[in-house]
Amino acid sequence: QRQMCIRDRGGTILGTSRQPFKLMRVPDKDGIDKVEAMKHTYHKLHLDCLVILGGNGTHKTANLLREEGLNVVTLPKTIDNDLWGTDMTFGFQSAVDIATDTIDRIHTTATSHSRVFIIEVMGHKVGHVTLHAGIAGGADIILLPEIPYDIKAIKNVIDKRTQAGKRFTILAVAEGAISKEDAKLKKKEYKEKLANRKYPSIAYELAEQIEKETDKEVRITVPGHTQRGGTPCAYDRVFATRVGAKAAELILNEEYGYMVAMRNGETVKVPLEEVAGKLKYVDPNCGLIKEARTIGISFGDEV
């Protein structure tokens, strides 16, 4: 009965917190070791198992607790779809639907004005949401963290569309999109550059560059945390139900230390130590990228 009440709710039912993994073993201001505190609570409550839902950071912590002797089973929950070992994560498709709807709505107004429109989509390190929403929404240019862009290539696409009589150009841009010049910087140098950047995000930096290169007006839309909220789509409800049922099966069989994954349409168990700390990036040479290029979508990398 409880499950029926929450199947159409997004977010976290029990609540959550953000704790950087690198600080898990660092005592807080009260001198409390967070890992030891979790172990103490686990045993105090006489728990059989911890079922942990989350993304990359969550799985690193879950694996740490496994190494500390706790019984753990995890579920892949993140809009980024960046967890290694699973084809899909729940939350991803709902976020793609929201981002796609945003691009669709921009198309409606874009047809009336000779402008460039930038939709900034969530994704700091990986571009799965941007890639799928960009294709589904009919973006002309898609910029991903995995494929550094060249502003000249973007200019060329806009110019060619203008010459062909197109009145607008739409860019789907991951918030972690990076230029070819910045991609050459060392990690520390790039972080310092971001810290000193005058723009609130990549979309605003791109907008200024595009206006300078093309003399086009640029408008920016940032759907932001709307991509993380609202009612989960039907796909995610079914997906979450399936991996949840598989997790219950593992617990009943006392099989601990696994993430429940989806591979080739089937729920499977993947050892946590194989998942923790690994990101699933967009492969620049994957079929989806190649197919997108075939239908004329630019990734801002070809001048």
Show where each model-derived region lies.
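Accessory alpha-helical/coil subdomains and C-terminal extensions
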Residues: 41, 49-54, 62-64, 92-111, ...
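Short beta-strand elements at the ligand-binding edges of bilobed clamshell
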Residues: 85-96, 231-237
